[in-house]
Curated annotation (Swiss-Prot):
One of its GO terms (biological process) is positive regulation of immune response. The lineage of its organism: Eukaryota, Metazoa, Chordata, Craniata, Vertebrata. Residues 1-32 form the signal peptide. The gene is HLA-DQB2. The chain crosses the membrane at residues 230-250. Coiled coil: none annotated. This is HLA class II histocompatibility antigen, DQ beta 2 chain. It comes from the Eukaryota. InterPro entries: Ig-like_dom (IPR007110), Ig-like_dom_sf (IPR036179), Ig-like_fold (IPR013783), Ig/MHC_CS (IPR003006), Ig_C1-set (IPR003597), MHC/Immunoglobulin (IPR050160), MHC_I/II-like_Ag-recog (IPR011162), MHC_II_a/b_N (IPR014745). SMART domains: IGc1, MHC_II_beta. It is a single-pass type I membrane protein. Residues 127-229 are annotated as: Beta-2.
């Protein structure tokens, strides 16, 4: 796997980069140009990694007004001119100490930063939350769509599978692409087309690096009568709670009321 990151460069390397840019812009080639009053000079350092730090490549790019004029590529090991303006950058290859410093940046900067990132971003893991819901309420033997929502996980690698009665379902599975939440976590929806039969059990199984074992969430197909009974039971339970609450309120108010005849003075 290849990976790329921007350099976090120690002060010494920044100083070297600024020195190179200033020298480039003060050469005869640069002095012959008609520089505008306002211009932009940039240094961009990038590290490229393959299989961790098995292979590391560092590239330092020197840019004037968004045009790269010179670079140092660790695979080449020397400064190279990209345009006429950067022609004199190759003179820096004669300064052996400075050249060795640039070559050493692969270890001192790239590999160093990789280890630092590995302890924070690269090893960060957040377990996913998994829920199942039908797209609509339908009776048995009617076409429907089950949605497995997998949310708030990191890193992005994830595997979501559907099962019907312990048998994996591959036909009728549709998935969204990974969705970035903007807080370094992801979410994904994996849908399964179904025609549920009485007693069917559908399972969404999720595998992720943050998990010791897969998460499994079940959804059971129910007949209309079973759903009605369940809803009736829930409704009865809620009504019971309401009447119980009203009874307690009435009793509480009754306890606060007068318990004997009012004082005689209040009758006149």
């Amino acid at each position: 796997m290849s990976w790329k990151m921007a350099l976090q460069i120690p002060g010494g390397f920044w100083a070297a980069a600024v020195t190179v840019m200033l020298v480039m812009l003060s050469t005869p080639v640069a002095e012959a140009r008609d520089f505008p009053k306002d211009f932009l000079v940039q240094f961009k350092g990038m590290c490229y990694f393959t299989n961790g730090t098995e292979r590391v490549r560092g590239v330092a790019r020197y840019i004037y007004n968004r045009e790269e004029y010179g670079r140092f590529d660790s695979d080449v090991g020397e400064f190279q001119a990209v345009t006429e303006l950067g022609r004199s950058i190759e003179d820096w290859n004669n300064y052996k100490d400075f050249l060795e410093q640039e070559r050493a940046a692969v270890d001192k900067v790239c590999r160093h930063n990789y280890e630092a990132e590995l302890r924070t971003t690269l090893q960060r893991q957040v377990e996913p939350t998994v829920t199942i819901s039908p797209s609509r309420t339908e009776a048995l033997n009617h076409h429907n769509l089950l949605v497995c929502s997998v949310t708030d996980f990191y890193p992005a690698q994830i595997k979501v599978r559907w099962f019907r009665n312990d048998q994996e379902e591959t036909a009728g599975v549709v998935s969204t692409s990974l969705i970035r939440n903007g807080d370094w976590t992801f979410q994904i929806l994996v849908m399964l087309e179904i025609t549920p039969q009485r007693g069917d059990i559908y399972t969404c199984q999720v595998e992720h690096p943050s998990l010791q074992s897969p998460i499994t969430v079940e959804w059971r197909a129910q007949s209309e009568s079973a759903q009605s009974k369940m809803l009736s039971g829930i409704g009865g339970f809620v009504l019971g709670l309401i009447f119980l609450g009203l009874g307690l309120i009435i009793r509480h108010r009754g306890q606060k009321g007068p318990r004997g005849p009012p004082p005689a003075g209040l009758l006149h």
